[in-house]
Amino acid sequence: MTKMEMGQSQHHEFWTIGLNVHGHDCRLPKSSLCWKTFYPLVDTQLVRRQPRPRLPKFTTIGQWYWGGSVEVNGTFPDLSKKIAFEPYLDLPKRIPEARFELAMNIKAEDSEKARLRERGWHIVDPHRVARTPSAYRRYMAGALAEFTAIKGVDVAWRTGWLSDRAAAFLALGRPVITEDTGAEKYIPWGSGFRFVRDAREAETAVKEVLWDWARLSKEARNGAVEIFDSAENLRRILAL
C-alpha cells in the first residue's frame, strides 16, 4: 500500500481499520498517503444479542491456509492461521470444560485435521456452517465467545487491525478473545474484548468467560453498539 497499488491513484481519501496506523509503535512502512482510521462495522439492528448457547464453545471462522504472498522486509512470511494458532493448540487439554472449535478450510483427507483433533480441537466446514449470512450469524451465536489468533504480521507490526467478524460476535453478545495487534488502546475497557499475548493469558480469558459469561456478554453487546455500530460510524466517516 506504499506503491499506489489497486488503483489507489484514483482515490480522494484513504481509510483503514488499522487503528494504530499513526501510533508511535506501529511498524508499517511509512507512506505518503494520508490514512484515516475507522472501526470495523456491524449493523447492530440486524445482529442482535442472543441467549446463552447450550455448549461452552469457543470458535472462529477463517482460512487455515493462506496462499497469498506479502513481502515483509524482503521476505515472504507465512501469514496463515495454521502458524498463528500454533502457540494455543494445547488449550483444549488445559481447559477440558471448554469446547474449542475451528470453522476452517481443512479437507477431510488433510493430515492437519487429524493433528488438530488429537490436540482436542473440533473442526467444521466453514462452507457449511457459514454458507449464507444468516447461517454465519447462527453459527457465531452458537458459541460462548470467539477465540482466535491473528496473522503474525499484524501482531508484529502493531497495525491495530480488528476484524468485522469480531464486531459481529460482540453484537451477538459474544465476548472476543484475540491477540493484541496494537488495537487494545483504542478500545475502552469493558467492551467485550480480552486481548491476549500468549497461551497463559488466553487460558485466563477463557476461564473468565466460562464463569462470568452473563456480565461479559452484556459488555460485548454494549461495546458493539457504542463502538462498532455501522450507522454511527458511517455518519462520522461522512461527517453527517
Identify what each model region corresponds to:
Residues 18-22, 105-111, 179-183:
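Short, polar loop motifs at secondary-structure junctions
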Residues 8-9, 30, 95-97, 118, ...:
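Short, well-ordered coil/turn elements that cap or connect secondary structure elements
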Residues 79-82, 86, 112-240:
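Catalytic binding pocket for nucleotide-activated donors in carbohydrate/polymer assembly enzymes
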Residues 1-38:
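Active-site-proximal region of nucleotide-activated glycan assembly enzymes
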Residues 6, 92-93, 210:
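N-terminal cationic-hydrophobic initiation segments that often serve targeting/anchoring roles
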Residues 13-17, 59-61, 99-105, 147-148, ...:
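A structural signal for short, well-ordered beta-strand segments and their strand-loop junctions
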Residues 27-142, 153:
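Conserved catalytic-core segment of nucleotide-activated headgroup transferases in glycan assembly
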Residues 5-6, 49-50, 185:
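Short secondary-structure boundary/capping segments
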